[in-house]
């Protein structure tokens, strides 16, 4: 069954990150099947598998919003934390990782950091509970940015 391919991305400290590739209905079904298989709901974290800036983040953003709206309207099967791997997604973009884009694109390191910051900021604004980043400098930058807002 195709569910198995999406079932388990990581299992750390007895928490399960379930990935359902930008499909809210499949996410809900996966949560139900996981609970039926014996995983406790409080041990589940959902990864909607969103893209980065320029590569489908708008669709991922809307899926996250719909999950949160369903959770707020009492959908118990979507009432689980949402995690995004924004660092990983950011570095899939050719604009973030390519060293051959020319001077107009700027230095590779600066560009990749900007891609990760923009992607993570958008996903935090969408309402994710956990954002996994790649660079400690980005964590510090985002903390400074959000201190003025929160």
Feature names for model-found ranges:
Residues 2-3, 9-145:
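Catalytic alpha/beta core domains of metabolic enzymes, predominantly
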